[in-house]
Amino acid sequence: KASYIHLRGSDLRPQFHQFTAVPHPNVKPMAYANALLQLGVM
């Protein structure tokens, strides 16, 4: 499990959120880098 805190509003009231991890997709590292370079994004 993991969690994060979101501070909202002018009083910075904390909201606590918990979630469970999901498996990463089976994608090679830097698989999208070539497409992004062609678009001039990076």
Swiss-Prot record:
Key words, A-Z: Cell membrane, Cytoplasm, Hydrolase, Magnesium, Manganese, Membrane, Metal-binding, Nucleus, Protein phosphatase
Biological process according to GO: peptidyl-serine dephosphorylation
Protein location: Nucleus; Cytoplasm; Cell membrane
Stored Gene3D superfamilies: 3.60.21.10
Names of the cofactor(s): Mg(2+); Mn(2+)
One Gene Ontology cellular component annotation held by this UniProt entry: plasma membrane
Origin superkingdom: Eukaryota
UniProt modification remark: Activated by at least two different proteolytic cleavages producing a 56 kDa and a 50 kDa form.
Note on cofactor: Binds 2 magnesium or manganese ions per subunit.
Catalytic activity as recorded in UniProt: O-phospho-L-seryl-[protein] + H2O = L-seryl-[protein] + phosphate; O-phospho-L-threonyl-[protein] + H2O = L-threonyl-[protein] + phosphate
GO molecular function, one term: protein serine/threonine phosphatase activity
Region (Required for autoinhibition): 38-42
Activity regulation statement: Autoinhibited. In the autoinhibited state, the TPR domain interacts with the catalytic region and prevents substrate access to the catalytic pocket. Allosterically activated by various polyunsaturated fatty acids, free long-chain fatty-acids and long-chain fatty acyl-CoA esters, arachidonic acid being the most effective activator. HSP90A and probably RAC1, GNA12 and GNA13 can also release the autoinhibition by the TPR repeat. Activation by RAC1, GNA12 and GNA13 is synergistic with the one produced by fatty acids binding. Inhibited by okadaic acid.
Primary role: Serine/threonine-protein phosphatase that dephosphorylates a myriad of proteins involved in different signaling pathways including the kinases CSNK1E, ASK1/MAP3K5, PRKDC and RAF1, the nuclear receptors NR3C1, PPARG, ESR1 and ESR2, SMAD proteins and TAU/MAPT. Implicated in wide ranging cellular processes, including apoptosis, differentiation, DNA damage response, cell survival, regulation of ion channels or circadian rhythms, in response to steroid and thyroid hormones, calcium, fatty acids, TGF-beta as well as oxidative and genotoxic stresses.
Family per record: Belongs to the PPP phosphatase family. PP-5 (PP-T) subfamily.
Record text on subunit structure and interactions: Probably forms a complex composed of chaperones HSP90 and HSP70, co-chaperones STIP1/HOP, CDC37, PPP5C, PTGES3/p23, TSC1 and client protein TSC2. Probably forms a complex composed of chaperones HSP90 and HSP70, co-chaperones CDC37, PPP5C, TSC1 and client protein TSC2, CDK4, AKT, RAF1 and NR3C1; this complex does not contain co-chaperones STIP1/HOP and PTGES3/p23. Part of a complex with HSP90/HSP90AA1 and steroid receptors. Interacts (via TPR repeats) with HSP90AA1 (via TPR repeat-binding motif) or HSPA1A/HSPA1B; the interaction is direct and activates the phosphatase activity.
Protein name: Serine/threonine-protein phosphatase 5
Highest classification ranks of the organism: Eukaryota, Metazoa, Chordata, Craniata, Vertebrata
